[in-house]
From Swiss-Prot:
The lineage of its organism: Bacteria, Bacillati, Bacillota, Clostridia, Eubacteriales. PANTHER family: POLYNUCLEOTIDYL TRANSFERASE, RIBONUCLEASE H-LIKE SUPERFAMILY PROTEIN (PTHR33317:SF4). GO terms for biological process: rRNA 5'-end processing. Keywords: Cytoplasm, Hydrolase, Nuclease, Ribosome biogenesis. This is Putative pre-16S rRNA nuclease. It is an enzyme of class 3 (hydrolase).
Length: 137
């Protein structure tokens, strides 16, 4: 059983995949967004390659727990993904995942240009790992 984690951005989608047993998450790519059809095509290829059964999408929430405009966009994207790929979609609170990703990359002494290229992939790993930790309990 493989689970895919997504960090949705305006320009890119960070993608992470679980190991076959569903214990650990690993970032695999960053999709440069084009349009809905091409985005779905890229996701379909990944889902087919890894035999994905569930997709976890980071849900941006406000610090008080409410869902704002970005969260609504993520939920719409989730519906689109579920319908287009016929794969179950779950949402995971992504508050502070990008902050955590930046902090980890700074501690690893990565250059600004390198951080910019991989931040969404790293954030998707945090999203998916949080979900995996929760379902394993």
């Amino acid at each position: 059983m493989r689970i895919l984690g997504l960090d949705l951005g305006k320009k890119t989608i960070g993608v992470a995949i679980s190991d076959p047993l569903g214990f650990t998450a690993q970032g695999i790519t960053t999709i440069r967004r084009a349009n809905k059809e091409k985005d779905m095509e890229e996701l379909r290829k990944i889902c087919d390659e890894y035999k994905v059964e569930t997709i976890v999408i980071g849900l941006p929430k406000n610090m008080n727990g409410t869902i704002g405009p970005s969260g609504e966009i993520a939920m719409e994207m989730g519906k689109l993904v579920e319908e287009a790929l016929n794969i179950k979609v779950e949402f995971w609170d992504e508050r502070l995942t990008t902050v955590a990703a930046h902090k980890a990359m700074l501690e690893a002494d990565l250059s600004r240009s390198k951080r910019k290229k991989i931040v969404d992939k790293v954030a998707s790993t945090y999203i998916l790992q949080g979900y995996l930790d929760r379902i394993s309990k």
